[in-house]
Amino acid sequence: MYSMGGFVFLLQEFSGNSSFLRSLLVFVPVIAIFWFLVISPQRKEEKNKKEMIKNLKKGDKVLTIGGIFGVVKKLGDTDVILELSPNNEAVFIKNSIDKVLSEKK
């Protein structure tokens, strides 16, 4: 039914698809490894930080991303007032809080 030239053409086309499938077999695991080593932990860290910021309350001792220690004096929607020392307060954006060191009991 097919001439020999048509058969050779089909073999060449099949060979090209096979090469594509081999490329996929290499590429898909690389993407999966990248996802589990880079993207997934970063998402988890972002989720934990959002939860920490949501649970901030007056009296918590915190550390900012700039390395400043303070005690939460007042909370706003997007900002927080930290007491750095007695009679010394500063306003920070909530996202600049890196860690809650201890919570008020």
Swiss-Prot record:
Pfam families: YajC (PF02699)
UniProt keywords, alphabetically: Cell inner membrane, Cell membrane, Membrane, Protein transport, Translocation, Transmembrane, Transmembrane helix, Transport
Record GO cellular component, one term: plasma membrane
Disulfide bonds: none
Keyword flag Transmembrane: yes
Compartments, as annotated in UniProt: Cell inner membrane
InterPro entries, per database record: Preprotein_translocase_YajC (IPR003849)
Topological type in the membrane: Single-pass membrane protein
GO process annotations (BP): protein transport
Protein's UniProt keywords contain Nucleotide-binding: no
Transmembrane segments: 19-39
Its biological purpose: The SecYEG-SecDF-YajC-YidC holo-translocon (HTL) protein secretase/insertase is a supercomplex required for protein secretion, insertion of proteins into membranes, and assembly of membrane protein complexes. While the SecYEG complex is essential for assembly of a number of proteins and complexes, the SecDF-YajC-YidC subcomplex facilitates these functions.
Subunit composition and interactions: Part of the SecDF-YidC-YajC translocase complex. The SecDF-YidC-YajC translocase forms a supercomplex with SecYEG, called the holo-translocon (HTL).
Annotated family: Belongs to the YajC family.
Protein name: Sec translocon accessory complex subunit YajC
Species of origin: Borreliella burgdorferi (strain ATCC 35210 / DSM 4680 / CIP 102532 / B31) (Borrelia burgdorferi)
